[in-house]
């Protein structure tokens, strides 16, 4: 084998035909140019992060004329039993890596409209919240929900909710003039309920305890409510400060059987006294003759 048949960056034991180096270089130059034509700033950042990750794992990077680094996997010698067969496996590794990058970039470009405003680091920690962002409208141009998650807590925060723009006008907080609300039908408590329940105010201090400061000069009247006076004679305060020197006698409280025996004795005495005014009952036949109940009609 001539020295030109050995590749400069390949490890020992890896031999490729001389045409593979030029062919691989041309393919790598064509593929990134085709991809870079439609790349945005987010996709370029993503490809740079992927290349850094592959370089940290021990892969080599080939620099294209457009200034972008395309990562390429390299074979690692694990022992004498593992060897890379001659042919084009290295070229297929280049093509597979490039195809994976194209697939990832196309996927990120499709979801770019709904996920561009959110940080990329939080996707692994909160997968449920990011799944809500994939809900698109029928046209697929704008997200159906406006969603601003709070990553510091478990609360899902919706800024506006569902999109409510009709012909460029937000109608989410508009009310119809024909709408009959509860306030219009029944009123509100603070306007329709009287705290005094219709009782007129008599004195400056005569006001409800909930709003004492609303009456002018309420503190000048002394007490909040004047003493109640139901008579013409002016009220005189009586001092009830008598302290007895001996215990007061207990109020007699007789049991029930004693009271019942006294009542029965009183009834017997009253019945005996009524015997002095006793009169015999009127005969029944006499009562019938007087009433005319025994007069039969005569037969002719």
From Swiss-Prot:
Keywords: Phosphoprotein. The modification Phosphoserine is found at residue 113. Residues 1-10 have a biased composition (Polar residues). The keyword Phosphoprotein applies. Disulfide bonds: none annotated. Residues 27-42 have a biased composition (Basic and acidic residues). InterPro entries: SASRP1. Residues 1-42, 64-91 are annotated as: Disordered. It holds the Pfam family SASRP1. Residues 64-85 have a biased composition (Low complexity). It comes from the Eukaryota. This is Spermatogenesis-associated serine-rich protein 1. It comes from Homo sapiens (Human). The lineage of its organism: Eukaryota, Metazoa, Chordata, Craniata, Vertebrata.
